[in-house]
């Protein structure tokens, strides 16, 4: 029978607490409130009234979180395939969703994580206890929609305070048909995932389904071997033209000297906007193509370099991407990020495997070829087996948490890959020089071609 877990101890309790001590004088009884929560009593005239400050940007509406009531009853369940059941409060969409539960250790950037296509098919549990306090804005989207299957949080902020906020997190999730659950013991679930590995789960607001039915549904679903990339890739090629304002111009000098001279074709496995912003900041012209576009059609676009982007799921489920990579290797410089790293790893002749609980967060240490340690932003559940690679391929980066392969170079093929996210969003920018390395590689290849 599924094991049920009570809500965390911080949940409001309405049972009276009695204390007795014969050595103390009895205290007068506290006033009994009939309303829940209690209305404020007559204010003390000596107490200074707090007057809210006027908005610094009155023309920008700042909305509060669309939470019905902070004391509403638990109306949602998270059911894991191991039989554990966690009761909580729903926010966002209603209904039932299935996915793989992973935990993310980032303290900021829930909007970027929510809109990262790499999270398609997954429920993201945030280890940060407070989520939703800055709402949702229109500038920090990493794609045009939310992709994660569900959101798990300890506490959903009841107030939104940010001058850029356009809507609350619950409002956005409802708009995007993503279900969320709060007031669950995220620390206990994280420890469970750490010890047992990733687990499939069900989030539901449907009280008619039994726990046993939901456990069976979770066990029947799997992300392994499933082509998730086809669900997030673009339908047809397009030119990246998103304006990059001053806040994104980190390489203005390089952009001025490169503008328009380098053409990058990006295979869209679920590419994040900030990856393209970073390449555009170096003056690259970017054409984004569907994940299944044949290599011959891509090479007909006369690219100076090929980007194999990040994306969701299992690299072994997309053999068409591996075959395209094999056909392109040696023709022009290539750069693989995250899923692109795994696809190129298989194209090099290597193998990939599923990690126990994956790497998800903005605080993962990686050692590069110079010995310098970078703090990186990571989001992946699969990795490349170093001992399966041919001797011509060098492992350039190592994840210092578990020793897994975090980057490769294949000098003869002008190929470089990293298993994590140099563009961050969210996360540190320690690995941003990878984009410049790719640009330098393309410039060198173009000079040789001109000779």
Where are these regions (language model features)?
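N-terminal chloroplast transit peptides
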Residues: 1-25
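RNA-binding accessory domains that recognize and position tRNA/RNA substrates
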Residues: 2-3, 25, 30-33, 39-301, ...
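Short solvent-exposed loop/turn micro-motifs enriched in small/polar/acidic residues
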Residues: 69-72, 359, 390, 400-401
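Proline-centered loop/turn at the N-terminus of a beta-strand
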Residues: 179, 263, 333-335, 351, ...
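Active-site glycine-centered loops adjacent to acidic/histidine catalytic or metal-binding residues
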Residues: 185, 338, 380, 421
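Active-site-proximal beta-strand elements of phosphoester/diester hydrolases
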Residues: 263-267, 376-377, 416-420
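Cysteine-nucleophile active-site neighborhood
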Residues: 300-375, 381-386, 427-445
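Catalytic beta-strand/loop cores that center a nucleophilic Ser/Cys/Thr
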Residues: 372-413, 450-451
């Amino acid at each position: 029978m599924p094991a049920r877990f009570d809500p965390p101890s911080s949940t409001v309790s309405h049972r009276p607490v009695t204390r007795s001590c014969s050595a103390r004088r009895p205290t007068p009884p506290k006033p009994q409130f009939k309303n829940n929560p209690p209305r404020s009593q007559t204010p003390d005239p000596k107490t200074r009234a707090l007057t809210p400050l006027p908005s610094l940007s009155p023309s920008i509406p700042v909305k509060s979180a669309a939470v019905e009531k902070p004391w509403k009853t638990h109306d949602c369940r998270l059911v894991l395939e191991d039989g554990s059941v966690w009761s909580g409060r729903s926010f966002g969409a209603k209904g039932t969703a299935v996915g793989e539960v992973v935990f993310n250790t980032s303290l900021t950037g829930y909007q970027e994580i929510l809109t990262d296509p790499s999270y398609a098919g997954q429920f993201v549990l945030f280890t940060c206890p407070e989520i939703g306090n800055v709402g949702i804005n229109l500038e920090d989207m990493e794609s045009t929609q939310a992709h994660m299957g569900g959101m798990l949080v300890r506490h959903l902020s009841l107030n939104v305070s940010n001058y850029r906020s356009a809507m609350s997190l619950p409002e956005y999730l409802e708009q995007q048909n993503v279900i969320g659950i709060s007031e669950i013991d995220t620390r206990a679930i994280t420890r469970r995932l750490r010890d047992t590995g990733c687990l499939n789960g069900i989030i539901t607001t449907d009280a008619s389904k039994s726990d046993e039915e939901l456990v069976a549904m979770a066990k029947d679903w799997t992300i392994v071997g499933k082509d998730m990339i086809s669900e997030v890739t673009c339908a047809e090629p397009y030119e990246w033209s998103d304006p990059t304002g001053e806040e994104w111009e980190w390489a203005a000098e390089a952009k001025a000297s490169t503008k328009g001279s380098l053409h990058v074709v990006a295979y869209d496995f679920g590419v994040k906007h900030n990856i393209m912003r970073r390449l555009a900041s170096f003056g690259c012209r970017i054409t984004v193509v569907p994940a299944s576009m044949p290599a011959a059609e891509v090479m007909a676009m006369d690219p100076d370099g090929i980007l194999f982007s990040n994306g969701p799921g299992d690299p072994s489920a997309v053999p068409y991407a591996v075959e395209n990579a094999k056909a392109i290797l040696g023709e022009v410089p290539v750069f693989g990020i995250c899923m692109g790293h795994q696809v190129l790893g298989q194209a090099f002749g290597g193998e990939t495997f599923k990690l126990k609980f994956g790497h998800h967060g903005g605080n993962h240490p990686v050692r590069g070829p110079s010995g310098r340690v970078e703090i990186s932003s990571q989001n992946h559940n699969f990795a490349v087996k170093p001992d399966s690679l041919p001797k011509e391929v060098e492992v350039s980066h190592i994840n210092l948490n578990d020793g897994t392969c975090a980057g490769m170079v294949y000098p003869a093929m002008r190929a470089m890959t990293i298993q994590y996210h140099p563009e961050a969003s969210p996360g540190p920018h320690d690995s941003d020089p990878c984009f410049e390395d790719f640009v330098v590689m393309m410039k060198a290849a173009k000079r040789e071609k001109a000779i």
